[in-house]
């Protein structure tokens, strides 16, 4: 496909980037730490951590992994925590030790956590005490030999940290009892690590930096193998696309999305580290009043988020009174940005809310709306520099402009494959091209629009939910005969999970089924709607047809609207 989008690029956005500007993320980080040593790198709960402190602490962390635990280059280390100052310390500590980061959603259930730890082969985990009870239930079933435990306030000043830890544990009671007798504290790791020798590993760009887990149409979470080069390429692509709105050494980005999410990891963390920017870490973005209070204290220049977050902010009275004069860049990703939200954002802030599109397998950025956009486009934008895309029909032929086809992507940000899953890798990677499973159209200027998802994936507030996983959990209930799961439109989260159930026992109630689901599934995966039916639509070979159920929902919605 001809790169028609290049002619729509702003004049100062290059067609290509240098994916090998740095030899590794280690070199990128160490250069930034030297260049911006005394400037703030991260802010959390009023505590400021400079680049110098981050360099010293991550070096100590790396040294302890190497000397204290005896871990080797290529070992996998899991990180399971929300946005705290401990996260970037551990992140860059693991990378600087030559090891591989395995990001884990701290809200995972024991079942989900066990799968990710076992599949990745993680030998160590860094976890915040709030979620230690989950780890306790499964750690003995995994290869994890070392547990590094931290508390919410452990990187705050002594007085503030003590207060935060007391409130979290005894007032809010957010730390359920756990028993991990061999765990070592994060503080002890840093104290001992400072006295140990750090040995800089021989890491090159093609080495793996992350196993970033994503679901699949089978419902089994798979680790996307992302190299140092993949991540650096995406960092450079984002920087090239939005450089005119960025000011190295002077930006402050609001980080409400969790850093374990690939979007925040690449854009908010890695990109703004390279740029010498400050990242304002929001630990609990669900507390909108608390978040707005934090925002009122800082003249932020950039913010990223999902549609759900922007909508919640716009509906907070205090947020509408903030000063947006310093804001230059607003980026929405993870789920479609709704027109009403984008227009309200522009009216309030005077800045466009630029929608982008990506997927874990692409580190994640694939497309983004240009920074000189004049109005909401409803599209996912243009392919970022050094990215090639094509739209193919079911026979593998390229479609004409304006016609729908499956979106395929090629570029330096595309993963190596799925960890230890060659068959799954072969299903999506062909001659360097990645099949996204999304159906899109492209106009004459190169703007892409997603019109459908080939996969059955449901997108809840930017998080992927896979029907098979939910159906497997529902099937564990003795009173369920069969079920089917689909996504339905939801004003708050974009989509919500709906489950259709054929009962095996007439006494089954929606409340009973949802209680069962909450035992096995993270909150955003738990169905919001339960509908009981006598039978489910099936193909002639007995396969349940989710498509028919989705079509029924569309018809009902259309009828209701009429």
From Swiss-Prot:
PANTHER family from the UniProt entry: LONG-CHAIN-FATTY-ACID--COA LIGASE
A Gene Ontology biological process term? fatty acid beta-oxidation
What reaction is this protein's catalytic activity? a long-chain fatty acid + ATP + CoA = a long-chain fatty acyl-CoA + AMP + diphosphate
Cofactor(s) listed: Mg(2+)
Which protein is depicted?
Long-chain-fatty-acid--CoA ligase
Indicate the enzyme's highest-level EC class.
ligase
Query: How does the record say this protein sits in the membrane?
Result: Peripheral membrane protein
Pfam families assigned to the protein according to its UniProt record, in alphabetical order: AMP-binding (PF00501), AMP-binding_C (PF13193)
Its signal peptide is: none
Q: In which pathway does it act?
A: Lipid metabolism; fatty acid beta-oxidation
According to its UniProt record, the EC number is 6.2.1.3
The taxonomic lineage of its organism, from the top, reads: Bacteria, Pseudomonadati, Pseudomonadota, Gammaproteobacteria, Enterobacterales
């Amino acid at each position: 496909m001809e790169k028609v989008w290049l002619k729509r690029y702003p004049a100062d956005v290059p067609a290509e980037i240098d994916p090998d500007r740095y030899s590794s993320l280690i070199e990128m980080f160490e250069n930034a730490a030297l260049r911006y040593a005394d400037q703030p790198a991260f802010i959390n709960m009023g505590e400021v951590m400079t680049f110098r402190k981050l360099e010293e602490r991550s070096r100590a962390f790396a040294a302890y992994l190497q000397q204290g635990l005896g871990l080797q280059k290529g070992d996998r280390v899991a990180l399971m925590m929300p946005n705290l100052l401990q996260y970037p310390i551990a992140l860059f500590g693991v990378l600087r030790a030559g090891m591989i980061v395995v990001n884990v959603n701290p809200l995972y259930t024991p079942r989900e956590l066990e799968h990710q730890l076992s599949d990745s082969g993680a030998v160590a985990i860094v976890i915040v005490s709030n979620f230690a009870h989950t780890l306790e239930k499964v750690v003995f079933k995994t290869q994890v030999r070392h547990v590094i435990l931290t508390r919410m306030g452990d990187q705050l000043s002594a007085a503030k940290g003590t207060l935060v830890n007391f409130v979290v544990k005894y007032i809010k009671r957010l730390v359920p009892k756990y028993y991990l007798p061999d765990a070592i504290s994060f503080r002890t790791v840093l104290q001992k690590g400072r006295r140990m020798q750090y040995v800089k590993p021989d890491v090159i760009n093609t080495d793996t930096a992350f196993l970033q887990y994503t679901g699949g149409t089978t419902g089994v979470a798979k680790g996307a193998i992302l190299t140092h080069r993949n991540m650096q390429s995406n960092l450079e692509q984002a920087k090239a696309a939005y450089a005119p709105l960025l000011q190295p050494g002077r930006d402050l980005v609001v980080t409400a999305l969790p850093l374990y999410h690939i979007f925040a990891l690449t854009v908010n963390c890695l990109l703004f580290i390279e740029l010498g920017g400050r990242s304002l870490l929001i630990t609990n973005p669900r507390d909108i009043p608390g978040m707005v209070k934090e925002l009122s204290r800082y003249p932020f220049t950039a913010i990223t988020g999902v549609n759900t977050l922007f909508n919640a902010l716009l509906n907070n009275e205090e947020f509408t009174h903030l000063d947006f004069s310093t804001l230059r860049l607003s980026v929405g990703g993870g789920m479609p940005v709704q027109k009403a939200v984008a227009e309200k954002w522009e009216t309030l802030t005077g800045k466009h809310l630029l929608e982008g599109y990506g997927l874990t397998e692409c580190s994640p950025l694939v497309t983004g709306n240009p920074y000189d956009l004049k109005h909401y486009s409803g599209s996912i934008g243009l392919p970022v520099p050094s990215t090639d895309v094509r739209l193919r029909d079911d026979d593998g032929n390229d479609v004409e402009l304006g016609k729908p086809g499956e979106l395929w992507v090629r570029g330096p940000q595309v993963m190596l494959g799925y960890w230890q899953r060659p068959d799954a890798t072969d299903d999506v990677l062909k001659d360097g091209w990645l099949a996204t499973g999304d159906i899109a159209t492209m106009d004459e200027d190169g703007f892409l629009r997603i019109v459908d998802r080939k996969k059955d994936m449901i997108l809840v507030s930017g998080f992927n939910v896979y029907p098979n996983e939910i159906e497997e959990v529902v099937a564990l209930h003795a009173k369920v005969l069969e079920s089917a799961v689909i996504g339905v439109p939801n004003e708050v989260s974009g989509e919500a999970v709906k489950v259709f159930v054929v009962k095996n026992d007439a006494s089954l109630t929606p409340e009973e089924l949802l209680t069962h689901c909450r035992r096995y599934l993270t909150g955003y995966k738990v169905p919001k709607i339960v509908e009981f039916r006598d039978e489910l639509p099936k193909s002639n070979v007995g396969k349940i047809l989710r498509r028919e159920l989705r079509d029924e929902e569309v018809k009902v919605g259309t009828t209701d609207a009429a």
